[in-house]
């Protein structure tokens, strides 16, 4: 979408994805939260680059995408959340996901939900996501 699209104007934070042409920022920060798509930070290989960015920006929560896999991980006191994808999930479960995140200081609570029924995702969906990311890492070596 172009920068002046009326839909984009509804949001305070917008970042560029790997298929966007518009000059959106690669990341934005807000109250110790970093938001990025993740494609410029090697998220398929791990979080080393995002850890550096979050440390530089004094962020303890990082929201990212790119892998289309719902995950929550903690590295070096930084919580990384990928909500998955609403329409193009990469798991065997056959539905999109989103995350609801409650932040109270450094206390972070994350719930992953089915994008159509809004039901909570079961832990096996998150476990499958972690296994899938490990497979991606091995394939990309």
What is the predicted role of each segment?
Residues 1-30:
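Core catalytic region of metal-dependent phosphoesterases/phosphodiesterases
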Residues 4-8, 50-54, 98:
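Short amphipathic alpha-helical segments and helix-helix/interface helices
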Residues 12, 33, 110:
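Hydrophobic anchor at the start of a short beta-strand
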Residues 13-18, 35-38, 61-66, 81-84:
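Active-site neighborhood of phospho(di)ester-bond hydrolases with catalytic His/Asp-centered motifs
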Residues 70-72:
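Residue-level recognition of beta-strand microenvironments
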Residues 74-141:
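Acidic, His/Gly-rich catalytic cores of divalent-metal-dependent hydrolytic chemistry
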